[in-house]
Amino acid sequence: FSPLRLFARAPADLDVMSAHVQDAVLQTGDMTFLDDKRRFVLVMNRFCWELPQKESLRVRSALQIGGILEAKRRNIRSDKPDSVLSLLAVRFAPNDQPGDALAGTVSIIFSGGGEIRLAVEACEAILEDITEPWPATRRPAHDANA
């Protein structure tokens, strides 16, 4: 096992990062917006998709999104910090404003319709493993027809 430390500075980088965090689980209380640093941070139990299929491990990882101008949530209750969320994807949509090619919105999408929408100055993210891995109880499965 080699810990991940990925940097995203372009939408294509964020797509790679999104593949690594698919099926991560976290609690609502594991997310925070650091207003003074204009940074959003979430800590999750990430499935190690980068390992061979016979290995099923999870690791505690931190995802940081920088340059936040505005943060919004949908269908995520901040008054229930123990609620469990399953992360589906992280996406970047550029603004359609002329002269603002780097700015856009990062969407962190969860199962059940939950979403964090972050207006950002540019695509800027860090994903870093912060613990040793442990055996996963099962490998996440996806319906091929979905």
Question: Locations of the language-model features?
Answer:
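A short, structural micro-pattern
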Residues: 36, 62-65, 84, 102
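Intrinsic, low-complexity N-terminal interaction/targeting segments
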Residues: 11-25, 70-108, 122-128
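Short, structured motif recognition centered on aromatic/hydrophobic residues
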Residues: 33, 38-44, 106-110, 118
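A low-complexity, Ser/Thr/Gly/Pro-enriched, surface-exposed linker/loop concept
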Residues: 46-51, 55-80
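Long, hydrophobic N-terminal alpha-helical segment
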Residues: 1-41
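Mixed-charge, glycine-accented linear interaction segment located at domain edges/termini
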Residues: 107-146
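Broad gene-expression machinery/nucleic-acid interaction feature
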Residues: 39, 60, 87, 103-105, ...
